[in-house]
A protein has these predicted regions:
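Catalytic core of soluble alpha/beta enzymes
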Residues: 1-50, 79, 88
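Flexible C-terminal active-site loop/helix
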Residues: 6, 44-107
Length: 107
């Protein structure tokens, strides 16, 4: 909040795994948006489940204008036994129309 109020940031990179998930990420975005600071969603080494959450947040929030959500692509098996959630074609993510994050998890 302080970085926004003192005009110290042009954009804020929200990382779901560092901030604690979707709810804290939404709070960060709301503070940034109230102070006219754009956001992006970034990732570290998240699985496809976490990336699906991040991409869903990007799609839902007008103030989030950028995304770096490609960590799952570097896995030996990018699907990680969890098909669905989204498709990527030419860097464009298309979300599933299934409920929730749209991922099929079969343990």
């Amino acid at each position: 909040a302080k970085a926004c109020k003192i005009d110290a940031a042009d954009i804020i990179n929200i990382k779901l795994m560092k901030c604690g998930g979707l709810c804290p990420a939404e709070k960060i975005n709301a503070i940034a948006e109230a102070n006219h600071v754009q956001c992006m969603v970034g990732c570290m080494l998240e699985t496809k489940v976490a990336i699906a959450a991040g991409v869903s947040l990007v799609a839902a929030k007008q103030n989030i204008t950028e995304a770096d959500c490609d960590s799952f692509m570097y896995a030996v098996d990018p699907e990680m036994g969890m098909p669905g959630g989204f498709a990527v074609n030419g860097g464009v993510y298309t979300l599933s129309d299934k409920p929730g994050l749209g991922i099929d998890i079969d343990f």
